[in-house]
């Protein structure tokens, strides 16, 4: 008998789903109570041009991650689709930082070695970068939350420049941050 495989995602895992017209992107990771890793390796599922695709270790070498301790990218947390180019997508990881994807291929992993994102866990040379929240503002800036550090809010401009905001005294290495919520509904601009 012939095997019939419907056009669907690779798996049923879903933490965050974002859409832009017909395109759908799904981060498949997650965390347990206390923001402890699930150690999910399911990658990223996306629906573009009427077809489901996946970015996993099997399809993309960079899904092995860059920190030498995990040897795989764990826990994809969130998705942000670039409003100026829906083929340009960012996916956060509770391990590796931020994956930048263009046309379904990873073009960069933003982490503690190439951006102001802050790594945690001295046992692992501070290479574990805990990122959840991602959101674009009306000017095309990508806002990113980085947990367990006072430098917990970062922005990546459309020109590729990173800026960081330090909340030392209000937020410290014990704080975990989730979603970025941007309110663009005012005459004075965006509020984070």
Positions of the model-derived regions?
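Carboxylate-rich, polar loop motifs that coordinate divalent cations or form catalytic acidic clusters
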Residues: 1-192
């Amino acid at each position: 008998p012939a095997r019939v495989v419907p056009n669907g995602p690779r798996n049923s895992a879903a933490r965050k789903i974002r859409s832009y017209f017909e395109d759908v992107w799904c981060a498949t990771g997650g965390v347990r109570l206390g923001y402890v890793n699930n150690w999910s390796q399911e990658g990223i599922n996306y629906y573009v041009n009427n077809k489901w695709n996946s970015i996993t270790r099997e399809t993309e070498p960079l899904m092995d991650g860059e920190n030498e301790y995990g040897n795989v990218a764990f826990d994809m947390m969130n998705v942000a689709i670039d409003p100026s180019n829906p083929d340009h997508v960012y996916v956060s990881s509770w391990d590796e930082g931020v994956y930048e994807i263009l046309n379904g291929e990873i073009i960069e992993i933003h982490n503690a070695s190439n951006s102001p994102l802050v790594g945690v866990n001295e046992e692992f040379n501070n290479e574990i970068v805990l990122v959840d929240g991602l959101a674009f503002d009306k000017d095309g800036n990508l806002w990113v939350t980085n947990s367990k550090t006072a430098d917990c809010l970062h922005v990546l401009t459309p020109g590729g420049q990173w800026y960081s905001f330090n909340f030392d005294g209000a937020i410290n290495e014990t704080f975990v941050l989730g979603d970025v919520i941007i309110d663009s509904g005012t005459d004075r601009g965006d509020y984070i």
